[in-house]
Amino acid sequence: MLATLIVAAMLALPQDPVARPDPAAGPVVRLEDVVVDAQRLEDAAEAFVDAVAAPVGSRGLARWNEGVCVGVANLEGETAQYIADRVSDVARELGLRGHEPPCHPSILIVATSDGAAFAEELIAMRPVLFRPGGAGMNQGPAALERFRTSDRAVRWWSVSQPTDVDTGQPAVRMSGQCSGTCTPPAGNGTSVYDFAPNTAVRSVSRLSSQYRQDLKRTFVIVDVDRIGDVTLQQLGDYIAMVALAQINPDADTGRFETILNLFDEPGAVQGLTGWDRAYLEGLYESEWYRVSQNSQVRAISTTISNEYRDARPAEPVDGAE
C-alpha cells in the first residue's frame, strides 16, 4: 500500500487511519461517451468547468505562465521523485517548462501524518506566503481557515497574481512595494501613488483585458494516514490536477469521471481522465485576455468541445449516461 510506503519513508510518526467516506451514488459521465453529441458535449463541458474552477473573486482563471518547479518534502527516494516527475511531466504536456533542481519550488508538496496540525504550523510561521497582501491574490481568510482545519487527505492552497502582460509586472500593489522615491522629502510625505502599481492602459474594452492571472505558488499537503489504498500513480495525477489549476476543493464532481473523485471512490479511476486532461488543456489553450469569468468558462468549454468533438467514443462503462 502507498500509505505504508510513504510512512516508512517519512520523517514523522504515523497515526490511526481515518475511514474514507462512502462513494457517491449515481451514473458517471465519461467524456468519451458524450463527444459524439455536440450539444451534449458542450453542455457537459461547461458544467464540468463550472464545477471545478475556483478563480479568486471576480477575477479570471489563473494558470502558470511559463514554467513550474516542483518540490517534495518529507518523502524520500523514489516516492518523492515519482511525484515531482509526474507533476512536471503533466506541466510539460500543457506547454510549460518543468524546471529541474536546483530551483526555487513554485509547487511545494509536503507529506505529513497530521495535515491539519502541519497546515496550522506552516500558516502561523509564514502567513505572508498564504496571504501576500496584494488584492485578489488568494481566496481570503474564510477559505484559508477551511484549508487549515480540513480533514481532507490532500489539501491545497494557491496564490495568484494579476499581471500586466506588457511589462510582466504585478497589476496590484504588493506588500512593501514602492515605485517612487520612497523617501519623504523635507516637509512632505511620500505620495500614496508611489505605493500603487504603475500600468499604462493601451486599450479600453468590455470584452478583453491587458491583464492575465498568473499562478505564483501552490502548497499541497498530503495527509498520509488519510490516503487509504490509492496508488502512487493515482496520487501523482491527483496532485498534478490540483497544482496546475485553481480547483475548487468542495466541487461536486460525482456525476463526472474525474481524478477529483479519487478519495470518494478510489477504484473508479486510475489517473487523469478525459475530463481532467480536457480541462487542463482547455485552460492552457484558451485566450487569457477575456474580462469576465463567464466568458472564460465558455472559452474553456468551447476549447474542450472543439478538441474532442471528433474523437471516437470509447465503450461506455456500466451505468454511464
Regions found by a protein language model. Give the residues of each.
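Long, low-complexity intrinsically disordered segments that are proline/alanine-rich
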Residues: 13-25
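A domain-level signal for the mature, folded cores of soluble proteins
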Residues: 18-19, 60, 64, 100
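Acidic/histidine-rich, surface-exposed loop or edge segments in extracytoplasmic proteins
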Residues: 29-32, 60-75
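Compositionally biased P/S/T/G-rich terminal and signal peptide-adjacent segments
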Residues: 40-64
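Long, folded non-catalytic interaction modules
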Residues: 71-86, 91, 95-317
